[in-house]
């Protein structure tokens, strides 16, 4: 029996041990961690303390945002020892922040108050700051070394770097302005001639007693670079020389970042590639002929795009565009388009070769069209073969062109055909390619030819279009975005010279009217009258328009929409 009691006592002790262990484990599971407590505190809105900064506005907002104390407000279980450590470091932290704003001798007082009755937090911290006098720039010493000291035309790069320096004597010193000034001057050197330029050393000597700063910086230009050969990587399908002619990288010219980016953009917008990235070799053994690498990813060989749209001029529109980037055997690109709307049905194709070294390329095109022209339905055909050249601002072309037009309707003019030699020139000189506020553009066409049917009659055709933007006051939105209002002046004049009875294809004559020409009139509803008083194309054209355009502000930002007043 004693033995039996001993066993039961041991069993009870073991059960008691597991019960106590389980209870302790349960207590541990129910006790939240520090991170859980801070999350719960953040969710309930509780805080370890409130923080108030008393200082002039120009420094108060900055301190409230960047003081280290802000990070610990959401910890309601913050211990007194930890809070004392934070308060001890707060003075140095505030001084460091104020120094970045140019205040090197501030008076700072930090007070801690118990607030047991405040629901927001049990403590209140008040940081009182008198920033003192702001440090200003007393002296500036900019120096340059490297090729910029001995190379030709050294004064220009140095002048650009000095002009880009943005922190000058008399201006207040801030760390951000100091960093920006060095970065701006360095970028001015790197953008042209010296892509490997670096900041050799810089120093800001601060005199806290006089509140003045003496700045010095030395830039090392490194060697002068010129564009070397262009190497294409990732290209398998196209002729390398033709692609280089699209890029038009000025081999042998002084390195210019803008030229490099323009060449990259020309390749990217050519349609032959999905991705393009150009880089200059900064470690070239011969900086005077530094190779440039174009890393490309070719676009699909063929692409089809289906479109649907609507316009007030021609109603609903359906279109199908097909691109074949490299025709078999010929190697040219073919762009074919089929479109239907209320006014016209068009099937056309244009084939273009890669450009030669001079930028000129061969172009061939054909178009079949049925279009409402005046009071008639006109079936027309056009064949065109010639050459074209496109540069950044100017496009040129010349071509031999065949036109045929058959008009259908009461008292319709007879079928007419013509053969002509045409040339065109377009110049664009705007301040922006996408949203110009100033500048001008001009397009001119000139052709000489002869009708083939019903009779042979020589003719001359000329057409000119002009557009001019005059900038006005800037429209600024609450978010700081802005764009200028503008006045747009547009004109279009044309003439076809031939004997009075010559039957010129109507596709070579002029009709106007519609939302892009003379607003208030339907599409191509202004023209000449035939002997039977039917509306038809005329031999002379003159259109002028003046329009005031002002950007609209929506949602606090400048939108892409504009209000307009116009006279056509």
Regions flagged by a language model, labelled:
Residues 2-14:
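Bacterial N-terminal signal peptides that target proteins for export
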Residues 11-25:
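Bacterial N-terminal signal peptides
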Residues 27-61, 71-312, 321, 335-353, ...:
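Periplasmic polypeptide-binding modules associated with outer-membrane biogenesis and secretion
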Residues 103-107, 195-198, 378-380, 418-420, ...:
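Amphipathic hydrophobic-ligand
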Residues 135, 191, 196, 224-226, ...:
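Short beta-strands and strand-coil junctions in structured, solvent-facing domains, enriched
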Residues 147-154, 158-160, 256-443, 516-531, ...:
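Gram-negative/organellar outer-membrane beta-barrel architecture
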Residues 269, 303, 411-414, 418-567:
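C-terminal outer-membrane beta-barrel translocator/porin domains of Gram-negative envelope proteins
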């Amino acid at each position: 029996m004693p033995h039996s009691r001993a066993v039961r006592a041991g069993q009870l002790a073991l059960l008691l041990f597991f019960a106590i262990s389980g209870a302790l484990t349960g207590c541990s599971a129910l006790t939240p961690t520090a991170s859980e407590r801070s999350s719960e505190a953040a969710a309930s809105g509780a805080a370890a303390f409130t923080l108030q900064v008393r200082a002039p506005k120009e420094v108060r907002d900055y301190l409230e945002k960047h003081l280290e104390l802000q990070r610990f407000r959401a910890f309601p279980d913050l211990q007194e020892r930890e809070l004392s450590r934070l308060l001890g470091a707060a003075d140095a932290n505030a001084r460091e922040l104020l120094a970045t704003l140019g205040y090197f001798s501030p008076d700072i007082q930090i007070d801690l108050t118990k607030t047991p009755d405040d629901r927001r937090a049990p403590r209140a911290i008040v940081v009182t700051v008198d920033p003192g006098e702001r440090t200003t720039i007393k002296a500036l010493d900019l120096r340059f070394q490297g090729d910029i000291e001995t190379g030709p035309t050294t004064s220009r790069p140095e002048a650009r770097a000095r002009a880009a320096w943005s922190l000058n004597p008399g201006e207040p010193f801030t760390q951000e302005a100091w960093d920006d000034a060095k970065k701006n001057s360095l970028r001015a050197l790197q953008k042209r001639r010296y892509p490997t330029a670096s900041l050799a050393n810089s120093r800001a000597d601060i005199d806290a007693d006089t509140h003045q700063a003496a700045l010095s910086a030395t830039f090392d230009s490194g060697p002068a670079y010129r564009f070397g050969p262009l190497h294409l990587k990732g290209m398998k399908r196209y002729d390398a020389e033709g692609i280089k002619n699209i890029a038009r990288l000025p081999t042998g010219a002084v390195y210019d970042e803008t030229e490099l980016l323009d060449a990259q953009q020309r390749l990217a917008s050519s349609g032959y590639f999905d991705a393009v990235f150009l880089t200059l070799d900064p470690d070239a053994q011969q900086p005077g002929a530094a190779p440039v690498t174009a890393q490309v990813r070719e676009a699909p060989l063929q692409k089809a795009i289906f479109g649907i749209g609507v316009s007030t001029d021609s109603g609903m529109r359906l279109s199908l565009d097909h691109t074949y980037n490299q025709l078999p055997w010929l190697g040219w690109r073919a762009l074919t388009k089929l479109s239907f709307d209320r006014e016209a049905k068009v099937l056309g194709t244009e084939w273009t070769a890669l450009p030669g070294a001079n930028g000129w390329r061969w172009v061939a095109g054909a178009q079949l069209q049925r279009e409402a022209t005046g009071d008639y339905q006109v079936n027309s055909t056009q064949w065109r073969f010639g050459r074209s050249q496109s540069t950044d601002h100017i496009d040129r072309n010349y071509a031999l062109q065949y036109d045929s037009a058959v008009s259908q309707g009461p008292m319709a003019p007879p079928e007419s055909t013509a053969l002509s030699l045409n040339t065109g020139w377009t110049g664009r000189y705007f301040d922006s390619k996408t949203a110009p506020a100033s500048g001008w553009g001009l397009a001119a066409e000139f052709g000489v030819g002869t009708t083939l049917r019903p009779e042979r009659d020589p003719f001359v055709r000329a057409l000119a279009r002009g557009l001019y933007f005059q900038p006005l006051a800037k429209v600024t939105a609450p978010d700081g975005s802005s764009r200028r209002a503008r006045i747009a002046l547009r004109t279009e004049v044309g003439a076809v010279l031939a004997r009075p009875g010559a039957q010129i294809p109507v596709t070579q004559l002029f009709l106007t009217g519609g939302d892009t020409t003379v607003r208030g009139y339907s599409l191509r509803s202004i023209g000449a009258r035939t002997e039977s008083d039917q509306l038809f194309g005329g031999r002379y054209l003159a259109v002028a328009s003046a329009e005031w355009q002002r950007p609209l502000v929506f949602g606090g930002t400048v939108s892409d929409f504009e209000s307009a007043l116009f006279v056509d």
